[in-house]
């Protein structure tokens, strides 16, 4: 939840999210170093470790998104359509939401569908999630990490780089709330 002040915003949820994302980014930096030193980072589980951290961070971002728009009479669909846009008519928060849903639910989609990457075997919500993700990165190994890398644009998986964009989105929420209040 945030409060609008004379100087801007007091946003305790964002402050908590930033603390978490910094911890995750620090861990991802450590993992990157271990990957560079390793002769077989895949067998050592280093890629999986990074993917896990990234997936957990996506769910924290999703929680921030939900706690921000839900304090007003703004529905989820409208909140997910607000700028900033990333590409193909998609918004940053819709992509982050899809990434979080992917992380949380992929294990429920059935082993065959996930291993073969057969979208036709998925339910409609899962298909929509994959469609959004594939607008930025292929559905493949380490999908969450690849998604963040494509959003950040520098080839790195660093989640703090998303915070300025989330702040822009929060400003859009505030503008929409002012319009409907």
Regions found by a protein language model. Give the residues of each.
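Charged alpha-helical initiation segments
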Residues: 1-45
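Short, contiguous, well-structured surface segments enriched in hydrophobic/aromatic residues
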Residues: 33-84, 90
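Long, hydrophobic, amphipathic alpha-helical segments used as structural scaffolds
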Residues: 65-76, 104-111, 177
């Amino acid at each position: 939840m945030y409060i609008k002040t004379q100087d801007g915003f007091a946003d305790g949820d964002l402050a908590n999210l930033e603390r978490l994302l910094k911890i995750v980014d620090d861990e991802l930096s450590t993992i990157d170093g271990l990957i560079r030193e390793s002769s077989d980072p895949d067998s050592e589980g280093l890629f999986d470790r990074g993917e896990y951290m990234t997936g957990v961070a996506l769910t924290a971002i999703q929680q921030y998104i939900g706690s921000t728009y839900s304090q007003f009479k703004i529905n989820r669909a409208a909140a997910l359509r607000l700028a900033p846009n990333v590409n193909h008519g998609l918004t940053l928060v819709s992509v982050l939401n899809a990434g979080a849903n992917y992380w949380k639910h992929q294990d429920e989609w059935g082993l065959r569908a996930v291993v073969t990457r057969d979208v036709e075997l998925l339910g409609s919500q899962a298909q929509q999630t994959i469609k959004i993700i594939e607008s930025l990165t292929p559905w493949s190994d380490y999908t969450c990490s690849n998604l963040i890398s494509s959003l950040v644009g520098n080839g790195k998986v660093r989640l703090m780089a998303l915070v300025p964009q989330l702040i822009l989105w929060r400003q859009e929420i505030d503008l929409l709330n002012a319009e409907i209040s």
